[in-house]
């Protein structure tokens, strides 16, 4: 005699698999949406005590560098270059932190390598 499950339990494994696939597809759609939203945003950060302000897009494209007039000195080119590097790095760090936080909301904290 063959044991049979009641109808409500039949195909339960297939339903769970379909549910998991739909959930993964929705997560992928949410990830793409959040990525697009982040890339459309602008991020601004300052460095060196406000001597430089840098604006980048969420796609990490440098859009604007504002220097405090006190910074510009022909004899201080190396200092100016260091300040610009610090400003760019500060805004990239800001973008990465916000991106990671937004993606964590979508993935529920699951670490997906290469996502951000």
Name each model feature, range by range.
Residues 15, 71-82, 86:
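Residues at secondary-structure transition points
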Residues 24, 60, 84:
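Residue-level signature of catalytic and energy-coupling elements of molecular machines
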Residues 40, 46-61:
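N-terminal intrinsically disordered, cationic/polar leader segments
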Residues 49, 62-77:
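A short interface-forming secondary-structure element
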Residues 1-39, 44, 94-116:
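Long amphipathic alpha-helical segments used for membrane anchoring, targeting, substrate engagement
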Residues 55, 66, 111:
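Conserved beta-strand segments that form the floor/walls of ligand-binding pockets within enzyme
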Residues 83, 87-95:
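Stable alpha-helical structural segments in soluble proteins, enriched in small hydrophobic residues
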């Amino acid at each position: 005699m063959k044991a049979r499950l009641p109808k409500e339990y039949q195909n339960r494994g297939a339903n769970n698999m379909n549910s998991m696939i739909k959930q993964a597809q929705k997560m992928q759609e949410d990830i793409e949406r959040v990525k697009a939203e982040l890339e459309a945003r602008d991020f601004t950060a300052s460095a060196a005590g406000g001597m430089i302000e840098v604006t980048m897009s969420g796609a990490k494209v440098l859009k604007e560098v504002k220097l405090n007039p006190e910074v510009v000195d022909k004899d201080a080119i190396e200092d100016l270059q260091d300040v610009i590097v610090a400003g760019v790095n500060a805004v990239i760090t800001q973008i990465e932190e916000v991106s990671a936080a937004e993606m964590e909301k979508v993935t529920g904290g699951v670490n997906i390598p290469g996502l951000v």
